[in-house]
Amino acid sequence: RVYIYGSHDRAGSDDFCDYVLKCWSAPVNDLNNWVCHGVTFRVKPDGDFPSDTDWTPDKNQILFAPDVVCRNGKYYLYAYIVNATGCVAVSDRPEGPFTLLSKYKYTISDEICCNGWFIDPGVLVDDDGRTYIYCGYERSFMAEVDTDTMYTIKDNSCIEHIIPITTDNDGGFDTEETLFFEACSPRKVGDTYYLIYSPKRGPRLAYATSDKPTGPFKYRGYIVDNGVDYPGGNDHGSIAQINGQWYIFYHRMTNGTIMSRRACVEKIEILPDGTIPPVEMTSLGFEDSLDPYRITEA
């Protein structure tokens, strides 16, 4: 099955996201048949269900962009809690529910990791089992995770500005469309490491590549632009290969508001030189466009 993890906007809300995370999945051979597995993690009491965290009583402490990785048959949720220390939770099943393991343990300066928030965590389990976390808001950093715990950040492993916030012509980061804003998502394709992120020109998902997980990274282009250009109208997402086809998962705005985002997906192609040609934003999902040469019943 294919699983999607993300923050959860409430319809008609005046705020981003919610105090719960949900998971959706579909069979790899039927990508139009999605089911919701319900709440997988929460930071507030929810009816008969207690909070999964005991340090998030404030109403403004809600769940933003998470990530989930699998290692040794366990599924690890990396939760970004606004205005609170982030944490890692674990499950035996990809759909959860996830049980709290621990807050992050780290010696990185609070200035770098935003007082332990670890904003927009993206996690990569490499082929050799080593695990890396990439984070940041208006400044990026990465570090290695101790796989004995999956929540401890290894000492002296932090690298700042993995994607720069000021122009750096050596790496091709020379305009606002290339510089870092937020939304790290690491992937490995063959021997190449990709870091997908939201640049200062927010509506896009840009990407950079390196031959090492620790960089240095080189700007390669953008994958999709969700078509808005106003404050807060940024994009989050990543790429995945399903049945031999690569896709970009991302979100777009709904009904002219930035607070009710909806998930989208487009087919992409990774060329032999590692570049990804930009694709158009659509609402097709996994369907193909209508054939203009065939009658379509409606």
Give the ranges of each region predicted by the language model.
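Carbohydrate-active catalytic/glycan-binding domains of CAZyme proteins
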Residues: R1-A298
